[in-house]
Amino acid sequence: MKKISIYLIATGIISLSSITAHSQSKFEKILKKVTTKTGSTSTTKGSSTATGTPTTSEMGFGIKEALEIGISRGTDLLSAKDGFLGNAAVKILFPPEAQKVERTLRSIGMGSLADNVILSLNRAAEDAAKEAKPIFVSAIKQMTITDVTNILLGQQDAATNYFKRVTTSQLMEKFQPVITTSLNKVGAAKYWGDAAGQYNKIPLVKPVSTDLSSYVAQKAIDGMFIQVAQEELKIRGSLGARSTPLLQKVFGYADQKK
């Protein structure tokens, strides 16, 4: 009888140990699942903060990155063949005071001469546009935190206005000699001289004398800023133009503030 009792007690202990081990194993599995789930939740929360408020440093890098992308794209477009000539928004035509020259030439069957003048003006601007990128990049590097904040949270053309303020005089200084050389290279001075000469021969007309170099330089600069403004609008308004996570974060923040 005593032996039977000992046997039953031993069997009970073994069974209890088995149950306890099984329960512990099951508990560990549940704990593991909870821990994993909690970890993934934390990770998700952590990643969501990446789309929150950017730091001052991130805003600076983001704006500069966006503008460098836009400036590079814009200057490459305008400096290519037909960059000015093939773009109605920036195409350079006869100076306002000389448009009567163009009309007269076309009316007397000399339209090809007028076309040559327009072609040469735009080729000169395309040559000059190659000089613009370093000037714009330098202006981007000089931006202060105040400039960056004003651009990020400012009007749709805030960056374009910044460039106008900072780079116009440098662009004119750089463009004018390039355009003068280019006008001579493409024969613009000759075409213009021929066109103005033919017009000035017409009785009773007021002779025209336009400084082509200054005119084309100013129109080329105007065209640069038109293109820059278009690139700025793309970055601000098109999610596809925000090509990096940093740009998405910075401009996403700007969207929320407006």
Residue spans of the language-model regions?
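An amphipathic alpha-helical core segment
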Residues: 178-223
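N-terminal Sec/ER secretory leader and immediately downstream segment
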Residues: 26-118
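Bacterial N-terminal signal peptides that target proteins for export
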Residues: 1-8
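Mid-length scaffold segments of soluble, non-membrane domains
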Residues: 110-182
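Bacterial N-terminal signal peptides
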Residues: 9-17
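Sec/Tat signal peptide C-region and signal peptidase I cleavage site
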Residues: 19-23
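A cross-kingdom marker for long, charged
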Residues: 26-39, 213, 220-258
